[in-house]
């Protein structure tokens, strides 16, 4: 199963500014960690470079990069298709868990969205002052909301959504 996980602003679907996340929401970070631990995560090179401590622990880290330059704690592939093929082979050999998470950035989200089975979104009500990176548009007719939890942390309202692709 291919899942996408992201924290986005409600109106413009903003996800970042200058290679940094827009929102630091503790429960969103906890949700991310709980969902992705023990699974494969796929990200672009810039997303990897934005991680403060490098590869995320207790996950299979895959980085998509135009170069095959080695990255400590990660597997590197030159395309999303190549990474998904390698992962599919490992799932078939029972060497990897079934669920795989796309964790960013914008280009990888856009490439993966047509293949995704599930979306885990945190929708933040407040638009950021600045943003230069955006999540692709989602066609609501293609997705069914299966879980919705409204929250408010430190005066910031947001919603956890889980969506499955309609058959």
Model-predicted segments: where are they?
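Enzymes that bind and transform nitrogen-containing heteroaromatic metabolites
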Residues: 1-167
